[in-house]
């Protein structure tokens, strides 16, 4: 089955994208398929494909974050036959502030963070920003190398 891997970072809006994808009859969105523990990524995708086929779906949509080790992501997810990729990137400062608010509240979904005020640490932001940029650069470079 063909698929799309959504490469994303924390608080990017990918959760909203997956909520929208649930409106398409032919798409089987799995935004939490790669939670820690259990089966390998490849086995999880195989099981998701079977489930999608039973539901009459023709396209898998998977969310890939830095929580998945890169070697596993390369071999079992992004490098899989028929898999395409797309990036979901939010303005980094907005993603970081949203992450800080969600962490402070312990609320990750369906919570209005507008009134929440947090103090930000510039050094922590710089470190987080470096990590996020390295994550996206890795996948951009990997995909460019693979295209030739």
Roles of regions detected by a PLM:
Residues 57-66:
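Conserved two-lobed SF2 helicase motor
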Residues 66, 71-146:
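PAPS-dependent sulfotransferase catalytic domain
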